[in-house]
């Protein structure tokens, strides 16, 4: 399996990215007209883990009504200012979702199923928290 994406430079520090012939989104190093490259990476991690969380909970017959994720990426002070830690805070709502099951779904997503997480440095700490709403 191979994923293909295409990126076009607009002459500044902005790029339009997406699948060839598909929908594009703006990536902006200054984060003025779109997320920065690092923001895009953090969004990819949030989206990837969220897909898994929703699927895992659906298999338990406890469908998610809403899900939001706030992501904090701590960065090194020196160039290239790589990520040194990530915190994912999941806010999940759905009738009948038990805390233990939501926590297990997040743990499995972060440690086993998310291909974005698995593609990052295994020594990069990725922590998570859960806010569960009825």
Language model region names:
Residues 1-44, 53-134:
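Extended beta-strand/beta-hairpin segments
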């Amino acid at each position: 399996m191979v994923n293909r994406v295409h990126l076009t430079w607009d002459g500044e520090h902005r790029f339009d990215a997406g699948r060839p012939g598909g929908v594009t989104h703006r990536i902006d190093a200054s984060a003025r007209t779109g997320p920065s490259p690092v923001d895009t990476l953090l969004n990819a991690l949030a989206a990837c883990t969220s897909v898994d969380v929703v699927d895992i909970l659906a298999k338990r017959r406890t469908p998610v009504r809403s899900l939001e994720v706030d992501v904090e990426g701590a960065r090194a002070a020196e160039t290239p200012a790589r990520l040194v830690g990530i915190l994912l805070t999941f806010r999940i709502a759905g009738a009948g979702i038990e805390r233990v099951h939501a926590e297990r779904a997040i743990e499995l997503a972060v440690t086993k199923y998310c291909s974005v997480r698995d593609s990052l440095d295994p020594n990069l700490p990725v922590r998570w928290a859960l806010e569960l709403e009825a």
